[in-house]
Structure formats: structure tokens, C-alpha cells
A protein has these predicted regions:
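Boundary/linker segments flanking structured domains
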Residues: 1-44, 49-55, 61-162
């Protein structure tokens, strides 16, 4: 369980579980297979390489569909999702071809409390609750991959302090 301390007296606890792995497949058109049991429920997910490098964090109303979209990149109607799907799919293919392993972690429940008391569950049916946990998990990362990825999208120069 990850505990995220907010600036106020509130604290959010997120429960992460390993649900499967990503492997290369010769019989699938794009070469990706997701192994494990990913639930068809709302939540937040992490794609990690070599068990330590968390490479991508996202959220979805249906985790099974969202994660499978990476295997079927190019079949989605929305252009922004298709771009993300192809980018993550390409990255996963490269990592797996380089001999690395990839795992999928999900968070389907999180709790909020004020000063450690009165813990309440954050309903993940609400997109904003998923976005809060996703943002906290991204902020919690210590590796540079996500940071570099986000910075590349900004067209002007800026200074980032660690």
C-alpha cells in the first residue's frame, strides 16, 4: 500500500497489486500478449519494466479494455488515445525485444483520511478520484523516464528542480 501525504491534513492510501505481465507473441499481429487476470473495473494501472522502473501510469473506467488497447493500438477512434496507445505499444515492444520483462500493477481501491482518522474509500467510478491517485503515483516516481517523457511535450525550455 502506498501512502501519499497531501499538503493539507489529508492522506490517501492506494492498494497496488501485481496482476500480470506483458510478453512478446509471434502469433499476434503486433507481437504483444497480456498475461494474467486484469479486472474489467475502474482503476489506475502502472506498466513497469524489470520490476523497478515504473514507465507509465494511467487510469481507466475499464482496466481490462484500457490495457488491452495497448495490444490493439490503431483500432481506437479517438486520435489522442490512439497516439498514446501506439507510443506505449512501441515502447513495450522495444523493451521486450531488448530482453527486459514488463509487469502490470493495478490499484482498484484507495482510501482517504484526515489526520489518520475517519478513513473513507474513494469510489473509482468517479474519474476525478482515479485522476487524484494517478497524479499522486506519478508525483511519487523517482525515476526520470516519466519526467523526460512529459518534458519532451513542452515546446519551450524550462528548469526542473528535483
Amino acid at each position: 500500500m502506498d501512502n501519499y501525504q497531501l499538503r493539507s491534513q489529508y492522506q490517501i492510501a492506494a492498494c497496488w497489486s501485481l496482476v500480470g505481465s506483458v510478453t512478446l507473441s509471434v502469433d499476434v499481429k503486433n507481437g504483444l500478449t497480456f498475461n494474467g487476470s486484469i479486472p474489467a473495473c475502474p482503476g489506475v494501472y502502472k506498466l513497469c519494466v524489470q520490476k523497478t522502473l515504473c514507465a507509465y501510469i494511467g487510469e481507466g473506467q475499464n482496466l481490462l479494455k484500457r490495457i488491452n488497447n495497448y495490444a490493439n493500438a490503431g483500432w481506437i477512434e479517438k486520435a489522442t488515445k490512439e497516439f498514446t496507445n501506439r507510443r506505449i505499444q512501441g515502447w513495450l515492444l522495444k523493451e521486450l525485444r531488448d530482453g527486459n520483462s514488463a509487469e502490470i500493477y493495478i490499484c482498484t481501491e484507495a482510501f482517504i483520511s484526515k489526520s489518520g482518522c475517519n478513513e473513507k474509500q474513494l469510489p473509482f467510478d468517479n474519474k476525478y478520484n482515479r485522476l487524484i491517485v494517478e497524479s499522486l503515483a506519478i508525483n511519487d516516481l523517482q525515476d526520470d523516464w516519466t519526467l523526460k517523457n512529459k518534458v519532451k511535450k513542452i515546446k519551450h525550455s524550462l528548469t526542473i528542480e528535483k
